[in-house]
Amino acid sequence: MTGRHILLVEDDRFLRRACETSLRQRGFSVAVAVDGEEALDKVRQARPDLILLDLLMPRMTGIEVLRALRAQEPTRGIPVLILSNSSRAQDAEEIRTLGVCDYLVKANLSLQELGDRVTRLLEG
């Protein structure tokens, strides 16, 4: 998995740092974005192998980011793992239709589990 490129989109700086550090220790290359607009800019600069995406962020929600990614052929197939505390049924239904690969609840987040799921998703 060494060198696989992950884009981490998370507005909470403490969680962002913890996830980034944990993933780097596993050998992943990690870019970070603090909101959806920055995430889309980073995707245009360098297509990641996987996106870890928060749903509730300033300026642009995770669902809006997903819609934008899925609307463009070059980004349509990028795997996305959601990190969120949102339990809204409407959000859950929409992210399923947008082809999200996995969903982790932040309140229950284990960095070990995050790393394991990222590894599994990237191994196919």
Give the label of every model feature segment.
Residues 54, 84:
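Active-site residues of response regulator receiver
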Residues 27-34, 42:
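Short hydrophobic/Thr-rich beta-strand motif most characteristic of the beta2 strand and flanking loop
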Residues 46-52:
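Active-site beta3 strand of CheY-like receiver
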Residues 35-38, 61-67:
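Acidic catalytic/metal-coordinating carboxylates
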Residues 17-25:
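Charged docking surfaces used in two-component/phosphorelay signaling
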Residues 10:
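Conserved acidic carboxylate
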Residues 57:
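Receiver (REC) domain active-site loop signature in two-component systems and cognate sites
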